[in-house]
Amino acid sequence: VDLLEQHAFGNYRQLLEAVTLSPAMGVYLAMRGNQKEDTKTGRVPDENYAREVMQLFSIGLVQLNADGAPKLGSDGKPLETYTQAQITELARVFTGWDYDGASSTDPAYVKKPMVNNPARFATGAKKVLDADIPATADGAAAMKTAMDTLANHPNVGPFLGRQLIQRLVTSHPSPAYVARVAGVWADNGAGVRGDLKAVVRAVLLDSEARSAATAPSAGKLREPVQRLLQWGRSFGAASPTGLWNIGDTTNPATRLGQSPLRSPSVFNFFRPGYVPPGSTLGTNAITAPEFQLCNESTAAGYLNFLQTAIASGIGEVKASYTAELALATDAPALVADLALRLSGGGISAETQATIATAVATINAGTDAGKANRVYAAILMLMASPEYLIQK
């Protein structure tokens, strides 16, 4: 997470290498301590990271056009981006990497980029996709070629650009939107490839992001964790100890059905190409990744968990509603203020009026009554479809 924050608006090539040499990633995907092949014992390099860095972090499974559409072969099927043999070759580049100065007295090594141990690095020539690495190249040189090759692959822009659009703006971006973002990925206007700041700017300022989102496929479902984070930020949630100990919020029946840093696998909480089956979205082949987290249990679990969090906090983490309590005697004003803060104008006047009518039924003649009005207004707004679907 620290690396992602550090490189979020930097260059993708640098981010890719930082993630690759991160001890945390090295442990997670078995690259740390990976050793060269041994013909006597039959040992071969671990292929886990070699597979995932291509499938998930850079080029994806199939070759893409600039607009994100798969390239098709003569048989009409998508063309694969890489083969098993190419995974095996890349895994040889990822040998010999380990902690930089592991020490029982100095824990700083767990944050330093991994370094290469020549004794464990695979010997001989190597190949990364179409790039040749000579037998004379050491671990650092081979890594540079691998990172350069992956970062410069034409798939990276449309593959990752589309996912950035999905996370920031809409689950089902048009091919033209993807192509425009991929174009900025390829060249930020100053000849620089992979400028993430420029790419994010292109995503957020694109005409499809700024225009009225009236199409049925527009927008995205807010992830449960993002809803919780917005509640905390909007209402000044604080942790007296500084530990922010909210526990595991994975349970779908009683909590969020999602928990920070606890995705069930390297494939994260949901697939970028997920299409909800048995739904109007599914009938129209509209991707909606976050809906993969949704079912009957999560719908009820989210509301029950949120109700408790709003009123009582989550353990030591509690919000403050001083400004909202000052508006509690005026239900329409309270709801309008909260709606603007939570949705940025995305909740209609009709929905606000309905919620305000319900809030007004709560007696505001006491401090407890005022607090209950605030709690109820926040809960109903954050439960409304117009809030849950961000447009």
Kindly give the residue locations of the regions a language model identified.
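Flexible, low-complexity segments enriched for small/polar residues
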Residues: H153, G157, G161-A190, R201-K391
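Active-site substrate-binding loop specific to GH73 endo-beta-N-acetylglucosaminidase modules
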Residues: V1-G247, L388-K391
